Amino acid sequence: AMFKVNDGFAATNGQHNFRILMLPDESNFMHQATEVMSNDRLGTTVIDREEDIYYNVRMRLKSSQRGRNNSRRVGFNLRFGADQPYRGVHQSVAIDRSDANSAHNTELMFDIMIANSGGLISRYYDFIKVLAPQDRHTKSAILQMARYGDVFLDAQFENGSDGNMYEYELIYSPNSADGAGNKLPSPDGVNGVRITDLGDNKEKYRWFFLKKNNRAGDDFSDIIAY
């Protein structure tokens, strides 16, 4: 377990503080250019709202291949232990810091309006101040809780998570490396496909239509039929 005392960064304007405590060597390793695209998770302790402490939380970076190595845009994805889900509900949450353009702020305002209008399908987000392992990443951010996952699906639809959900994605191929031959996240090549019939082989769909739930079933029949 880790703790921090009187660091002077806590929000005093009503924002919820979300502290992520991590060993400096591991944080530095995670942010190396050759490591930022790894989805391997490292251990952290999370302190929520200066009261609730979560141990053995596993964290990776969150953003695009260009954003993860950008201190203004990089975010975090945290997975909580099965014995201590976040706020008693969520096995994972994400923190979005990517305020690089005004479009991001517009999207956030739509999320807030939809969530508070009642009777509409919406994600559940919250404003926070993230106190990150590295001070340069400490700032206001968006805490993404019930994203388009099982908690969201079951809350909005009867037996919602029984179905299959896919996320359209592009494939990014690094085009450069450091002196040791380790790939760097950019520059890169980008490949995609149109939403069209790719045949009956699910491997043609796997990396363009990422399976977002019920992964153990490895079922791509719905997207193939679509």
Q: Which role does the model predict for each range below?
A:
Residues 1-56:
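Regulatory N- and C-terminal appendages and interdomain linkers associated
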